[in-house]
Each structure stands twice: as structure tokens, then as C-alpha cells.
Amino acid sequence: MATATIRIAILDMYDGSPNIGMQCIKNIIMEWQQRKRVQTEVVVFNTRGNGEMPAHDFDLYISTGGPGSPLDTVQEEWDIQYTIWLENMLVIHKPVFLICHSFQIACRHFNLGTVCLRKSKQVGILPVHTLIEDALFTGLQETFYALESRAYQIIAPNDDKLKQMNAQIMALEKMRPQVPLERAIMAIRFSENMYGVQFHPEASLADLIIYFNEPKTKQSIMEEFGVEKWQKIVDHLDADSPIQTTYSNLIPNFLDKALNNEPRS
């Protein structure tokens, strides 16, 4: 990949909803650019809101998280065009990183598992357990921590389809020995160049401290989950929080791999 100017497309899947993810992604790219001493051009496409789709001439693509059901939009035009784009990206081997809602849509479209509602909504700073070694996880522990905010999950992996695509499950959600429920899939390597995660690796410690202490956010979590849940979340956001390690490594590792065109480890 040419390093003069690296063109990055961000597919905005927020559908106009307030979020901190977009700015966090831009901050990661800016910090990475400065560290690598490269130039980047970042273009945002309002995919869900306006049906905007990037051309195939970008060097890499990041598709954001977003609200709502990944099952209810199958017949919507933006969703149809988005899944066509996913298939095209696999064919032309462009680096793609899918976050949360984007990951769920990809799993649904490629039939890699069952996409369904969780028994209850998940929110918090929670452990992710890796299953394989991969350059994406460089700098992270075998179990690392990430922000989760989701009502949906992917379970019951379709092993035949995974094998057919040469895709691989990379991580599962936290172990819950006391809960007789299947652990959800947290990351998949769809191909040599396409990765997807169920969590939010773009979340920075500083932004999360502000977000979870905002009166509206605090009240919403307390009303839905209770005071103890909110307190547990903010307790994870101290100076030694492992969330910053995830922020500093995972998406930058994807950018490094895209820049260097490194082979699968």
C-alpha cells in the first residue's frame, strides 16, 4: 500500500444517534498517523442515514457500531447495498474493520451464526477471551477488557459456513460458569483482510469517564440496571483501567496490518 496518503473510509452506522464512537475512531487514526509519520485522508459516509457507500479506491475501511436491531433492516435499501459492499470487499481483498452493529450485520449476511436478542442488555467494561493468536491482538493479554453496549449477540456458530469462507472465530465473551447460556462470539476473522468485533475497541478511557458521568447516561443506566451497575462501570475507569490498552492497540494493530499488508500470523 502506498504510504504517501492513506485513504480511509469510515462507514457511519449510527443513523444520526448521539455517540462518542465516531470521534474516538478519528482520534485513533490521528494518533496512529502521527506515530507512523504518514498522511491520511479520512472520509465519512452516512451509510444508514443517507445510504452513502464508499467506492472501492480507498486503502482501508472502518464500519462503526450503531443502534437498533441487525435483523429488522434486511429489506431496507441501505442494508442491501451494505451487504453487497461486504461481498465486494471480500473479493477485492481490501482491509475492513467491522464494529458491533456492523459485525452483527456481517454475521447475519454470511450466516456465520445465530443473531439474536440477549436475555438482557449488556453494558459495561467486560472481559474478552481470545481463542487464537493474531496480529490484531498484539499488545493485549489473552483476556483483555473492552466496552460492551449491546442488546444482540451471535451464538451457535455455523461451522460449515465458517470453513467454507475460511473464516475463524477469534474471541468469545466472558466466562460465566454460573449461567447456563452459550458464550457469544466476540470477534471473527472473516478473511485475511476483514475483521469484525462485537465490542467497542475505539472507546478511550478519557471519553468513557466523561460519557458515563454525564447525568443523562448515569440516570439511564441506574434506571435500567441499578446503582450498583453504574458504580461498577465507573470503578473500571480509573487510571489503571485496562480499557486504554485496548484503545491503544486493537484498531492501531488493524491499521498497522493494513499499512504493511502483513500475512496472517
Regions found by a protein language model. Name each.
Residues 10, 44, 97-100, 148, ...:
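A structural signal for short, well-ordered beta-strand segments and their strand-loop junctions
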